Amino acid sequence: MGKPTGFIEYLRELPSELQPDSRIGNWDEFHLPMPEEKLQTQAARCMDCGTPFCHTGTMLKGMASGCPINNLIPEWNDLIYRGRWREALDRLHKTNNFPEFTGRVCPAPCEGSCVLGIHNPPVTIKNIECSIIDKGWEEGWVEPEPPTKRTGKKVAIIGSGPAGLCAAAQLNKAGHWITVFERADRPGGLLMYGIPNMKLDKKQVVQRRLDQLEQEGVKFICNTEVGKDFPTENLVKEFDAVVLCTGATKPRDLPIEGRELKGIHFAMDFLTANTKALLDHSKNGNFISAEGKDVVIIGGGDTGTDCVGTSLRHGCKSLVQLEIMPQPPLERAPDNPWPEWPKIYRMDYGQEEAAAKFGADPRSYLTTATKFEGDEKGHVKAVHTVTIEWQKNEQGRFIPSPVPGTEKVIPAQLVLLAMGFLGPEQPLLDALGLERNARSNIKADYGKYATSIPGVFAAGDCRRGQSLVVWAFNEGRGAARECDRYLMGSTDLPA
């Protein structure tokens, strides 16, 4: 590395951001650019560690350790320290088709496995990645690169989320004709409608890449659901191969008393409608408003956090986020050693904003809803909760048990269910006759991605289950490689 003592000389520093109480008044991204000289010193903190773990992409105890797409992190950190930004961008694009997406929304498992992080705060890998690609766009270094020749092969990609876009980009580079089917009115899937604008700007960031893909020859067909608007049987007739990237969009429900009441919605319905109204410039459009309401969000993951941030920007009256798991410790527990993902207490952007407005972290840990209470008009007015404790049953599995005397009633005119996803929607899979695994995901081996039907591949959450955007990138690229091998007999596409 260019600065072997950088990790000793420089402290970890993250970019400045707009204050929570001011940024909730708009839908803009709130992280501010870091000056290049500061980025160079942050890159200099990357150690000459001998065996980097940051780019390993290994699964440890069900969670990612290191970058799932094997980003060449030490290489581009060194190049940034030396001021060689264009070369750093080239290194970044070798493994990541869309670093502006992961640089904004990835939880950065690379930082959790950074060797420096064993004893000191890790290198700010995520911010450096985002800064490299943002500078690339600003300097005009990111340009459409259509393939110089075409193979004549046609590939259909079903779904334009992160896995679908990576598969499309890679297969288009290989020279195949790519058609991406998307049932929404805009391409992008989760990136367009599932992640709020303040985390990932749709017009300035997402649409920019979509435009580039179109300029490179990728064809997007929106408002088209395969199986309804486009006959399923035509897929295998009209295309030489098919890559399914439909996501895991079936939400987990909460079938307790009062579930049928008005005002109880799945989180993704809330987030999608909000972003669509924002993009359509429709203040009075068909979206679910939290304005002036007591909001209860059930679920403590990223989607729940996005519901927190969105509700605050609507102008909610109050906000409580129920989390069934215990509050994590402030530091790594002994059974959570490096290089595992550190399971520690964090305040994400949504909780920071809620604390700024209401005075405290909105999360209520070890709490579950037991009943929804309605008014005389059939609208939810309160959520009944109880504190739980995790106890082992006879099979040795931990199950939640209610603690007597801890019952509470929380006022709520809007309840958002953000408890994760159960898997892909089944009608298209049924129509194709695809085999599925025990979790109802498409059956296709990791690394091969081939389904039970020759020429049909699966990638992303529809194959692996609910996961991170960066894992979708990994699978989209991998499926593209195997699809290209199927079409041509061999492949030059990287993993």
Question: Can you describe what each PLM-predicted range is?
Answer:
Residues 5-16, 20-32, 40-44, 57, ...:
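Beta1-alpha1 glycine-rich phosphate/pyrophosphate-binding loop at the start
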Residues 13, 17-37, 42-45, 365, ...:
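C-terminal catalytic lobe of FAD-dependent flavoproteins
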Residues 24-38, 64-65, 69-104, 108, ...:
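Ferredoxin-type iron-sulfur electron-transfer modules in oxidoreductases and energy-metabolism complexes
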Residues 87, 149, 154-158, 210-256, ...:
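Feature captures the FAD/FMN-dependent oxidoreductase FAD-binding
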Residues 131-149, 206, 211-228, 251-314, ...:
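Glycine-rich dinucleotide-binding loop and its adjacent helix/turn
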Residues 158-162, 299-301, 461:
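Glycine-rich Rossmann-fold phosphate-binding loop(s) that bind the pyrophosphate
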Residues 260-292, 391-466:
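FAD-site-proximal beta/loop scaffold in flavoenzymes
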Residues 304-307, 314, 462-493:
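A conserved FAD-binding loop/helix module that cradles the flavin
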